Amino acid sequence: MTLLLDTHFLIWIVLGSKRLAAFPWIERYRPWGVSPISLLEIQFLAEIGRLSVHNPQFVNELMDDPRFTVDDAPLVTLVRHALRLDWTRDPFDRLLAAHSTARRVPLCTADRRMLAHHPLLPLELRE
């Protein structure tokens, strides 16, 4: 795994969002790393109506999509790293940043708070 996708990047890729046009370099990082935390977040967003998913098997199909590698980092490791990340109160963001840190791979995100605080970003996202 050379890159871990933040949840919104994963959603953009799956839905073929036009927002990806601003990030043509992302293709170089295939297959993209995905945290199980993102899969849980997608399910949560669908359950609360913030993401319209008409296929009940959507998350399961993502796990089998050859474009992605689901990285099964030990949860206890992620929690240990997440405990040190006090710059966000979002548990999903905290665990995704922790996953990136634990695996020492860049986190691909467009989240301003994460861009400002997380030290492991792709060169293309560093200011």
Regions found by a protein language model. Give the residues of each.
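Acidic, PIN/NYN-like endoribonuclease modules and their adjacent C-terminal/linker elements
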Residues: 97-127
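Short beta-strand scaffold positions
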Residues: 5, 34, 72-73, 109
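Short loop/helix-cap segments at secondary-structure boundaries that form the rim of catalytic
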Residues: 23-26, 64, 114-120
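Alpha-helix capping/helix-boundary segments
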Residues: 9-10, 38, 77, 96, ...
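Short, well-structured N-terminal submotif of metal-dependent ribonuclease cores
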Residues: 1-34, 48-61, 124-127
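Acidic catalytic patch
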Residues: 57-86
